[in-house]
Structures are given as structure tokens and as C-alpha cells.
Amino acid sequence: MPAYDPNNPFAKILRGEFPCYKVHEDDHTLAFLDIMPRCVGHTLVIPKAPARNILDITPEDFAHVARASQKIARAAMTAFDAQGITVQQFSEAAGGQVVFHLHMHVMPRHDGVALLPPASRKEDGKVLEANAAKLIAALK
């Protein structure tokens, strides 16, 4: 498996070099809205630890990501009046991974509404700001 690349986009977000629509941060994780969402409220949860994917993250760091993902999922159910949640994680290119920093996709779902194709459109910043505010309010 290739080594972790500290110049990946999510590492740059963690260092403040790239902006994001942050909804949650703690000592071990960061959660922010996907700028190319597959549904309303599509959130990414990442570890602050350098981890390429699920194959190389420590069990302790993965536990932090799992806890934060659950917290986001519960808040997203409320914030977006969802009827379910899809959580996805892709590892390595053959597994569908595009950004090589571990990330969990947390997507609020509604009956009969299909997910958009991956990376099919970039969401408007004002929409992302409004959705971030809803999720932040539900996290309180």
C-alpha cells in the first residue's frame, strides 16, 4: 500500500490551507460538509491522525472516527428530517477511494430519493452554509 500523502486535500483542510464548511471538531476528528454532496446534508468525518484509509488507521483513531460519525448521523436525522442514514467508507482506488485520507460519508436519506452520482455537481456555498447551520444547531 502506498504511503500516506500529507499533501492530500483533507490534510490541507486540517492545516487550514483549504476552507471547509465545518460542522464538528474535537481533539481527534473533524466533520465538514461535502462540497459535491450526493444528498442534502452529506457530511465527511475525518481523523486528525494521518491515515490513508481503514487499512492503516489505528484501532483507537478509528474508534474516534466511528463515535464522531455516529454523533453526526444522529444530528443529521434531526437537522434534515431524515428517515435513514447511509454511512460509506472506501479504501484504495479499486475500492472507490478518491481522496487518500480516511473519511466516512454520512448521508441523511429520505424514502424514494436516490443519491446523486458521486462528484456530479458542486453545491452553492450559500446552500452549504445553511445546511451547516442546521447540522450545527442539531448537534447542540
What is the predicted function of each stretch?
Residues 1-140:
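HIT superfamily nucleotide-processing domains
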